[in-house]
Amino acid sequence: AVELIVGLHYVYDAPQDKIVFDVGHQAYAHKIITGRRDAFRHNRQKDGISGFPKRSESEYDAFGAGHSSTSISAALGFAEAAKLLGQPYKSVALIGDGSLTGGLAFEGLNNTGVSKADMLVILNDNNISIDRNIGALHEYLLRITTNPKYNQAKKRVWDGLGESRFRNMLQRIVATTKSYLVRGSGGHLFQALGFRYFIFISCAKSVRHRLENIRINFKF
């Protein structure tokens, strides 16, 4: 999430643009680059900074997160407010795959798709959560990332080439192969909910370019 958060702050003009985090575990890099680097050593300690985004702590913390699955609905609120007030700021929700299994996140997706709000939802599908993810939506995302064609191709590549000084190059090839094989299935659910879906980003170097393209060229 570090590269993604740096990319978001490079492309979007926070605090005018609203970057909304789901819970606080993805927001540490955000806190460090928004004036709290020295205070971060006291993160989650008595009299230290909060472990979660906190509006009273920084103007860059657009929404006070705590409970999971709230980011999409909160970002939708900012987007609707911008439209009603005639303000030009953008609204972004960053949510992990664990939080996306919560009912409030699904409600937010449904309402956002209907509203056609000018906002961006980023799914950080890192397969990390405090407890094991459960539910139909998790199973859907799991099927996307465990496509058998991708795994078979990956196994053949590594079995055939083994250890090599070109390992880094081969890892990039595998990532590109994964992107190609799953791109056709990844967006069906989100498109059905009314979203314009963009293929996932597997290479950190492409984060800034992809975000700039979306920020400048698309109104949702």
Task: Give short role names for the model-derived ranges.
Residues 1-115:
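Cofactor-binding active-site loop characterized by glycine-rich and histidine/acidic residues
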Residues 22-23, 94-95, 120-124, 220:
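Short beta-strand segments
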Residues 127-215, 220:
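Long, well-ordered, tryptophan-enriched scaffold segments
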Residues 91, 119-120, 197:
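Hydrophobic anchor at the start of a short beta-strand
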